[in-house]
Amino acid sequence: MFISISAGIVTFLLTLVGIPAFIQFYRKAQITGQQMHEDVKQHQAKAGTPTMGGLVFLITSVLVAFFFALFSSQFSNNVGMILFILVLYGLVGFLDDFLKVFRKINEGLNPKQKLALQLLGGVIFYLFYERGGDILSVFGYPVHLGFFYIFFALFWLVGFSNAVNLTDGVDGLASISVVISLFAYGVIAYVQGQMDILLVILAMIGGLLGFFIFNHKPAKVFMGDVGSLALGGMLAAISMALHQEWTLLIIGIVYVFETTSVMMQVSYFKLTGGKRIFRMTPVHHHFELGGLSGKGNPWSEWKVDFFFWGVGLLASLLTLAILYLM
């Protein structure tokens, strides 16, 4: 436990030092920052804010987790595969950000390219991680999927990678939402005695807390796709490594809600010839524009943050209660 906590502290300190250096480099190199293409007027002031800051907490977390696990004899197949997903999905996000920032391609990677790279990572993860017989745990009951587990694994990794990416639209929202989710998985890992996975979790929590100091409202830096895609993939990988896949539907309710809102909006828009359910999706923008109803007073970014963090925290506590108190 001491090793895991130490890893989190080291990552926190390294990120705390690394982010200001990253921002300074960004400014000196006169790199064009985040472009704003949203209809939320208050976001227009954010144009030019340095992005790709997720690169800092990703590098520090992966390196610290790797070396701490290696030198404490806690490096395992599961640790290796979680770090692999972080690196590969981080590279996908980096390429996406690179095309947007340096090549001025607003779309970045097109959907097919991004999906292909994410699926590739999912296939490699499936082939090498310790699966335990391709068994899916559904509320504690084993479901034998056999060969079909690979389709679940791909759906899980790609789905939650993109879901966290959608959540990253308000200052600080995604970073602390993921911290809350990781805390819940840290408890599960500790109870299961999987200290190797706990080490990776605490290393990333440290990195995200260090990043949040510069990412809260008003954000001095954004994590970019390099951070959000990696974090979503990590959560999915951890839920599978702990054989508690179903828990991510509750622990990750914020990401599920954000993604579902987009799917509902697009489907309803097509079916009704242009009508909308929400003012704007992902749904955090709906709250920004008009509160819960969409027709009330706009919510500040802090209010949106605390609402979603509260939902995520309650969902995480509910999951732990279901697992260990019922």
Swiss-Prot record:
Belongs to the glycosyltransferase 4 family. MraY subfamily. Its EC number is 2.7.8.13. Keywords: Cell cycle, Cell division, Cell membrane, Cell shape, Cell wall biogenesis/degradation, Magnesium, Membrane, Metal-binding, Peptidoglycan synthesis, Transferase, Transmembrane, Transmembrane helix. PROSITE patterns: MRAY_1, MRAY_2. It is found in: Cell membrane. Pathway: Cell wall biogenesis; peptidoglycan biosynthesis. This is Phospho-N-acetylmuramoyl-pentapeptide-transferase. It is a multi-pass membrane protein. Catalyzes the initial step of the lipid cycle reactions in the biosynthesis of the cell wall peptidoglycan: transfers peptidoglycan precursor phospho-MurNAc-pentapeptide from UDP-MurNAc-pentapeptide onto the lipid carrier undecaprenyl phosphate, yielding undecaprenyl-pyrophosphoryl-MurNAc-pentapeptide, known as lipid I. The lineage of its organism: Bacteria, Bacillati, Bacillota, Bacilli, Lactobacillales. GO terms for cellular component: plasma membrane. Pfam families: Glycos_transf_4 (PF00953), MraY_sig1 (PF10555). InterPro entries: Glycosyl_transferase_4, PNAcMuramoyl-5peptid_Trfase, PNAcMuramoyl-5peptid_Trfase_CS. PANTHER family: PHOSPHO-N-ACETYLMURAMOYL-PENTAPEPTIDE-TRANSFERASE, PHOSPHO-N-ACETYLMURAMOYL-PENTAPEPTIDE-TRANSFERASE HOMOLOG. GO terms for molecular function: metal ion binding; phospho-N-acetylmuramoyl-pentapeptide-transferase activity; phosphotransferase activity, for other substituted phosphate groups. GO terms for biological process: cell division; cell wall macromolecule biosynthetic process; cell wall organization; peptidoglycan biosynthetic process; regulation of cell shape.
